[in-house]
Design a protein with these regions (language model features):
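Short, Lys/Arg-rich flexible segments
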Residues: 1-84, 88-93, 98-143
């Protein structure tokens, strides 16, 4: 059998070993920086579609836009870190904001869809990744 041995650069190994102890502190900050980019794009797209191109005058109260937010970064049972950009559930009229957002995104009988989430996801993907990479690099350099 052939045998191969690879050695990693020493400075890289030192960074990884220092990072090991602080990943629980660093990863939430990295995810939050990426979520800010996505949230701003979703907010921009949502503002553009709410009340636009309607037959009747818009009845928008602004509750959906105010309910948009980002959850805290949390670690699931498998050890993966997650953060969510979405809507709070409570509304003054009893409906959920997720339902209203779904109706806006996909439409319903007599109401054409006005997608804002899916375009925001695809438009902000690269900038989100770049922002998170830059934040991770700055956090690793700060160790």
């Amino acid at each position: 059998m052939a045998r191969a041995m690879m050695k990693m650069p020493e400075d890289f190994l030192m960074k990884v070993s220092r990072l090991e102890n602080k990943t629980d502190e660093i990863l939430p900050r990295v995810l939050e920086s990426g979520a800010e980019v996505v949230e701003s794009k979703v907010r921009t797209n949502l503002s553009a579609v709410v009340g636009a191109n309607t037959k009747d005058e818009s009845r928008s109260t602004g509750e959906l836009e105010r309910a948009l937010g980002t959850s805290q970064a949390r670690q699931d049972k498998d050890g993966n870190w997650n953060i969510k950009v979405g809507f709070d559930e409570s509304r003054s009229d009893g409906d959920s904001n997720a339902k209203i957002a779904n109706i806006l995104e996909y439409g319903r009988h007599g109401q054409a869809p006005k997608p804002f989430l899916k375009p925001a996801k695809s438009q902000s993907r690269k900038s989100c990744i770049e922002t998170m990479k830059a934040k991770l690099e700055s956090e690793v350099e700060g160790i």
